[in-house]
Amino acid sequence: MTNLRKTHPLMKIVNHSFIDLPAPSNISAWWNFGSLLGVCLMIQILTGLFLAMHYTSDTLTAFSSVAHICRDVNYGWLIRNLHANGASMFFMCLFLHVGRGIYYGSYLYKETWNIGVILLLTLMATAFVGYVLPWGQMSFWGATVITNLLSAIPYIGTTLAEWIWGSFAVDKATLTQFFAFHFILPFIITALVIVHLLFLHETGSNNPSGINPDSDKIPFHPYYTIKDALGLMFLLLTLLTLALFSPDSLGDPDNFSPANPLNTSPHIKPEWYFLFAYAILQSIPSQLGGVLALLASILIPLIIPFLHTANQRSMMFRPISQTLLWILTANLITLTWIGGQPVEQPFIIIGQLASILYFMLILVLMPLAGLFENYMLKPKW
């Protein structure tokens, strides 16, 4: 009798993607994050669905509907905490996933990489519109500041901003639109994830050494299903610890106050996962220049494949490039810290220096390091 998973049209797709998939025998725990991101997406869609059943996207009732979810709905507090902290876990896994891609040269699978960057942008858009929904002080002022950036675009800026607002300022129409976007975007993300996997399975996974692994492959199940299960346990443990013991530690206290257009928050800032880009935006005095720098900082992964100069794919045996990548990591942490600080000295100058270093590292220093490492590898006799 033929095995059903190998003959059934639907089961066959699942089988080729998750069971009999040939995977390199040497991929490390850094390759866990793809499956963890899939789990995060499922958690967000499920918790979001239950929250949407009780949420009302109206400026008069949005804030109280979130309070109602936490007070009156069975386990509503848990669903909300899982959803809010699930977003933080999602971005943490995403940054590690992208970092692994840069370290091991996975960006040379250009189609997979480009879809990944589009996924990153879509996810950032989803998180931004989602942050506006509770209609607290920081939600309102965050939406006002970020959407106002569109007005810096010459000629069409003001029209574009008013189109996004659905009014002449952030108001009821904005909230309704953002709720609609926040509901539909995760399903678009799911479709993009399928395309991401489709392109990945065309080439097969990269591996730490960066060399062709075709001569030594093992089936994904049971080896990597077990390995991924360990990462999954760590993810769920961290998420539940956050959601149950310290659910508001990553949020902003201002969001416990209902939105008030007449009272501006002293320091408007987005969620922690956007702070690095926000710091780059703030470091440039010109509004248009800041918007362009913000866009460049997020879109820069698109050109990383074209800046690869090294003969070796992975950074595993390239100590200079490794050092530069860790400096970039420290730089991003510095930018995240600066993004959460008030716009005053010494934070302004630190932010400006960190912003310059961010672009210098990616555009100049890392490609030069690759060329230097090529030279060092050449026999000198």
Swiss-Prot record:
Function summary: Component of the ubiquinol-cytochrome c reductase complex (complex III or cytochrome b-c1 complex) that is part of the mitochondrial respiratory chain. The b-c1 complex mediates electron transfer from ubiquinol to cytochrome c. Contributes to the generation of a proton gradient across the mitochondrial membrane that is then used for ATP synthesis.
Membrane topology: Multi-pass membrane protein
PANTHER family xref list: CYTOCHROME B
Family: Belongs to the cytochrome b family.
Protein's name according to its UniProt entry: Cytochrome b
Listed Pfam families: Cytochrom_B_C, Cytochrome_B
Quaternary structure note: The cytochrome bc1 complex contains 11 subunits: 3 respiratory subunits (MT-CYB, CYC1 and UQCRFS1), 2 core proteins (UQCRC1 and UQCRC2) and 6 low-molecular weight proteins (UQCRH/QCR6, UQCRB/QCR7, UQCRQ/QCR8, UQCR10/QCR9, UQCR11/QCR10 and a cleavage product of UQCRFS1). This cytochrome bc1 complex then forms a dimer.
Residues bound to a ubiquinone: H201
Residues of the signal peptide: none
GO MF assignments: metal ion binding; ubiquinol-cytochrome-c reductase activity
